[in-house]
């Protein structure tokens, strides 16, 4: 086994946001959560180094994860990546295991499989990337698959600038290596910071073996700006789409479809172009038509859309919800709502037809109220159901009716004023001959 240390103390200035960088989301999840999940998949001893807005980050983490060991970086005294793992006396923070893996919190695309080459190394090791264009990165000079030295770009000569090997920002160390060299680190550099790369340099100077482990570039993309966040999200989306299609989900124009990590699929499902699946959703034997939005809802044996919106806590089973229908906290069982309706805070029974323009009036300006509709109900177009209200089974509601009282089963309900036709009324109103 090994211990994992995740570095998350930075300010994330380039994100230009009051939200801590590591809490910015990738496909609906804070990017820190991805790296924590990966860490717990390989270790029972996970450490998180915090400083900037640490209480906010800690609160978010504790809502989801148990067993994280929190540390506060002493940035006033020991800043930088090397300082992040230092205690007050410059010794490394205590870990359960002798092998220590160090990761950055702003790399949400890292997976267990991507880390495998680094985990297999028995020596102290640094993860490397091979970049076609390494401009802006420090170069790693190799000799017989071992790290010879690390050169910052500004200090590299012309030959070294041609090197494509760069530091991925992940490390595997033995604890005795950290205990030996971490106290020797200094901050005599332009930034006045302690660097993990300098730790490696100290080891190389004393003939320590440092393995160079090449990793997949795509999995170790660092997120330091909104542009990089968007790029990481697109890569994550490609993974989620592929996983869904591998399960048999049909996607029309998949690049136009957005889905989040909490979405699960069962049975035969079709997603048309422009569909958005947000939060924890279950899509089972369902056809989600073009440009529909499903949030925190369950769609089972049903068709939804096009241009429909299932807001949180909608459970739509054996039903058809058509274009421009919005549901919220609604339970539909065997229901047809073809067009232009709002169905909020309601339960609707089997074989019920909801006409165009029907609205459940669920909010009285102070609180929400529920509408209960039985089975075999026909609701005429442009009707308003003013909650709280209970409509029995086998009920017919005439078009344009406003319902304010409960309707017993077997009833016909009408509330329209009688129609009046005034002879020559058009000409009188417009004063035309």
UniProtKB/Swiss-Prot annotation:
Q: Where is this region: Pyrophosphorylase?
A: 1-226
What does the record give as its pathway? Nucleotide-sugar biosynthesis; UDP-N-acetyl-alpha-D-glucosamine biosynthesis; N-acetyl-alpha-D-glucosamine 1-phosphate from alpha-D-glucosamine 6-phosphate (route II): step 2/2; Nucleotide-sugar biosynthesis; UDP-N-acetyl-alpha-D-glucosamine biosynthesis; UDP-N-acetyl-alpha-D-glucosamine from N-acetyl-alpha-D-glucosamine 1-phosphate: step 1/1; Bacterial outer membrane biogenesis; LPS lipid A biosynthesis
**Annotated region (N-acetyltransferase), positions in chain:** 248-433
Quote the catalytic activity from the record.
Answer: alpha-D-glucosamine 1-phosphate + acetyl-CoA = N-acetyl-alpha-D-glucosamine 1-phosphate + CoA + H(+); N-acetyl-alpha-D-glucosamine 1-phosphate + UTP + H(+) = UDP-N-acetyl-alpha-D-glucosamine + diphosphate
Q: Where in the cell is it found?
A: Cytoplasm
Q: Where is the active site?
A: 339 (proton acceptor)
Q: Which gene encodes it?
A: glmU
Q: How is the cofactor bound?
A: Binds 1 Mg(2+) ion per subunit.
Its required cofactor(s), as named, are:
Mg(2+)
Q: What is its EC number?
A: 2.7.7.23, 2.3.1.157
Spell out the protein name for this chain: Bifunctional protein GlmU
Q: What does the record list as GO biological process?
A: cell morphogenesis; cell wall organization; lipid A biosynthetic process; peptidoglycan biosynthetic process; regulation of cell shape; UDP-N-acetylglucosamine biosynthetic process
MF term (GO), any:
glucosamine-1-phosphate N-acetyltransferase activity
Binding annotation for UDP-N-acetyl-alpha-D-glucosamine = 7-10, 21, 80-81, 138, 152, 167, 224, 311, 328, 342, 353
**UniProt xrefs under InterPro entries:** Bifunctional_GlmU, GlmU-like, GlmU_C_LbH, Hexapep, Hexapep_transf_CS, MobA-like_NTP_Trfase, Nucleotide-diphossugar_trans, Trimer_LpxA-like_sf
Q: Which Gene3D superfamilies match?
A: Hexapeptide repeat proteins, Spore Coat Polysaccharide Biosynthesis Protein SpsA, Chain A
Enumerate the Pfam families for this protein. Hexapep, NTP_transf_3
Q: What exactly does this protein do?
A: Catalyzes the last two sequential reactions in the de novo biosynthetic pathway for UDP-N-acetylglucosamine (UDP-GlcNAc). The C-terminal domain catalyzes the transfer of acetyl group from acetyl coenzyme A to glucosamine-1-phosphate (GlcN-1-P) to produce N-acetylglucosamine-1-phosphate (GlcNAc-1-P), which is converted into UDP-GlcNAc by the transfer of uridine 5-monophosphate (from uridine 5-triphosphate), a reaction catalyzed by the N-terminal domain.
What are the binding positions for acetyl-CoA in this chain? 356, 362-363, 381, 399, 416
Q: What interactions and quaternary structure are annotated?
A: Homotrimer.
- Report the source organism: Helicobacter pylori (strain ATCC 700392 / 26695) (Campylobacter pylori)
């Amino acid at each position: 086994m090994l211990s994992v240390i995740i570095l998350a103390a930075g300010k994330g200035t380039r994100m230009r946001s009051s939200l801590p960088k590591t809490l910015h989301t990738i496909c609906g999840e804070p990017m820190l959560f991805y790296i924590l999940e990966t860490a717990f998949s390989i270790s029972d001893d996970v450490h998180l180094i915090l400083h900037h807005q640490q209480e906010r980050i800690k609160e978010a983490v504790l809502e989801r994860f148990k067993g994280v060991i929190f540390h506060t970086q002493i940035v006033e005294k020991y800043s930088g990546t090397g300082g992040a793992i230092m205690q007050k006396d410059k010794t490394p923070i205590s870990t359960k295991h002798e092998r220590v893996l160090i990761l950055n919190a702003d790399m949400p695309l890292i997976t267990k499989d991507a880390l495998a080459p680094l985990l297999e190394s028995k020596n102290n090791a640094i993860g490397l990337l091979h970049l076609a264009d390494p401009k802006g990165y420090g170069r790693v000079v190799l000799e017989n698959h071992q790290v010879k030295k690390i050169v910052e770009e500004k200090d590299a000569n012309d030959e070294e600038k041609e090197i494509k090997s760069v530091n991925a920002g992940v490390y595997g160390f033995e604890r005795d290596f950290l205990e030996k060299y971490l106290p020797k680190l200094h901050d005599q550099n332009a930034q006045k910071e302690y660097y993990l790369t300098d730790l490696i340099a100290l080891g190389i100077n004393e003939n320590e073996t440092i393995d160079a482990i090449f990793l997949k570039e795509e999995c170790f993309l660092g997120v330091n700006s909104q542009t990089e966040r968007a790029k990481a999200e697109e890569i994550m989306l490609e993974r989620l789409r592929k996983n869904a299609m591998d399960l048999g989900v049909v996607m029309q124009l998949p690049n136009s479809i957005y889905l989040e990590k909490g979405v699960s699929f069962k049975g035969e499902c079709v997603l048309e172009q422009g569909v958005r699946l947000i939060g924890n959703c279950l899509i089972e034997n369902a056809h989600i038509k073009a440009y529909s939005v499903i949030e925190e809802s369950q769609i089972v044996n049903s068709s939804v859309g096009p241009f429909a919106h299932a807001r949180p806590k909608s459970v739509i089973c054996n039903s058809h919800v058509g274009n421009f229908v919005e549901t919220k906290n609604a339970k539909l069982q065997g229901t047809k709502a073809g067009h232009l309706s709002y169905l909020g805070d309601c339960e609707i029974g089997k074989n019920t037809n909801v006409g165009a323009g029907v609205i459940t009036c669920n909010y009285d300006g102070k609180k929400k109220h529920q509408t209960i509709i039985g089975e075999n109900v026909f609701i005429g177009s442009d009707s308003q159901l003013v909650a709280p209200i209970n409509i029995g089974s086998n009920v017919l509601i005439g078009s344009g009716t406003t319902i304010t009282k409960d309707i017993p089963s077997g009833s016909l309900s009408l509330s329209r004023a009688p129609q009046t036709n005034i002879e020559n009324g058009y000409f009188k109103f417009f004063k035309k001959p």
